[in-house]
Amino acid sequence: MYGKIRISAEIEIKTGMHIGGSNAYSAIGAVDSPVIRDTLTKDPIIPGSSLKGKLRTLLARSISQSIILEKHNNDHDSIKRLFGSSGDKIGDKIIKSRLIFSDCPLKNKDKLKEVGSTEIKFENTIGRIDSVANPRQIERVIRGAIFDFKLVYDIDNKDELEADMKNFAHAIKLLQMDYLGGHGTRGYGKVDFSIIDIEVMENCINQDEKAKIIEILRDVG
């Protein structure tokens, strides 16, 4: 049995978020640490790779019996089948990720037009020994920005579907208690998820199974 589930959601930024982009060609006086942006629209985005990496790490930590995480190829099987495994050496089994992430574009650009979608936060570190100040400017996506989240789950084994959805939902809940992007321990990157739509393709599961999946995911937010 094979099919796909498409999950649509909104990610609302609750505190300024910084996911860094390139400043290789910044002019003199430019922001020290800009956010990553869509090349075409110039709007900030949340890269799918950032989401995938953060969710995998949080889920691995919640399952791991050790404080220090193993290499990702040594993750629990329930994590590897969701996020994939490339293998460390020739002959290792390669596991394709069942979760297919996409970059998340800014959704409420028009609402933010007057104030802008980002802000510049001025920070300063002071050396304990010499008391020398090191000022810096960090660009952040502002509180209230909403991003369009799309994810596809490949149904490779229907017997594992419910467990996979529970693990995915658990990872989302962990993220909402953690942070996305950098500088999270200083208050950056708090986010909320709101599931908008769950679409099952190919009619690969019945209505009762679909209702169960919806129940699991609706509990996220």
What residue ranges belong to the model's regions?
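RNA-binding basic/glycine-rich loop and surface signature characteristic of RAMP-family CRISPR effectors
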Residues: 1-221
